[in-house]
A protein has these predicted regions:
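Active-site-proximal alpha-helix that buttresses catalytic centers in soluble enzyme cores
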Residues: 1-176
Length: 176
C-alpha cells in the first residue's frame, strides 16, 4: 500500500489563536478533501518558525524539513498544497525548496495558490461580493494585503479591477 500525504504549506503566524482559527481549519478542510492522505504542516517563513520555537517551544517544520521527514517515513506520494494567495515570493521559495526532494518520492505534486487563473479571481470576487452587503452611498469595503516587491503584487490590482468589473466600485483593495 502506497503511503500518501498532503503537506499544507503556509507562510505561518506567530499568534497561536490565529493558527487555531485560520490555518488549522484550512488544513483540516484540505485534508477532508483528500481522504487517504496523512496531513502534515509546514510554514515557509523562517522568522515565524524561529519565533514560535523560541517564544513558545513550538517546533513546526519548514518545507524542506517536512519533506525530509515524509521521505524518511517512507511516504511515496506527496501533494504539497500552499495556502498562499498568489504566485509570489513565498510560493517561489516553496517551489525552490521542494524541487530537490522530487526524486525522493514516487510522486510529488503541487497545488496552486488561491489566485492563479483569471477564473480564480472571478470566483473569489464573486464569493466575497456575495458575502458583502449591497453597495451603499458613502460606504466602502476595504480588503488589505501585505504587498510585495515581487511582480506578483499586480494580483492586488487585478483583484480590485475584478471587483469593479463585477459592479462593486465600493470595494477597495490595498496593501500595507
Amino acid at each position: 500500500m502506497t503511503k500518501r500525504a498532503v503537506l499544507v504549506a503556509s507562510f505561518g503566524t506567530s499568534h497561536l489563536d490565529t493558527l487555531e482559527k485560520t490555518i488549522q481549519p484550512i488544513e483540516w478542510d484540505i485534508a477532508g478533501r483528500m481522504p487517504g492522505r496523512v496531513l502534515r504542516r509546514a510554514f515557509t517563513s523562517g522568522m515565524i518558525l524561529r519565533k514560535l520555537e523560541e517564544r513558545d517551544g513550538l517546533k513546526i517544520d519548514s518545507v524542506p524539513q517536512a519533506l525530509e521527514r515524509l521521505a524518511e517515513e517512507g511516504f511515496e506520494d506527496v501533494v504539497v498544497q500552499p495556502t498562499h494567495i498568489m504566485n509570489g515570493e513565498e510560493f517561489d521559495k516553496l517551489m525552490a525548496q521542494a524541487e530537490p526532494y522530487r526524486a525522493r518520492f514516487r510522486r510529488l505534486a503541487f497545488g496552486r495558490p488561491l489566485l492563479t487563473t483569471l477564473e480564480d479571481y472571478r470566483d473569489l470576487t464573486a464569493a466575497l461580493s456575495e458575502a458583502l452587503p449591497e453597495p451603499e452611498a458613502d460606504t466602502a469595503h476595504v480588503f488589505m494585503g501585505h504587498g510585495t516587491e515581487h511582480f506578483a503584487n499586480a494580483a492586488y490590482c487585478q483583484l480590485s479591477y475584478m471587483f469593479h468589473d463585477q459592479g462593486r466600485p465600493d470595494v477597495l483593495v490595498g496593501t500595507v
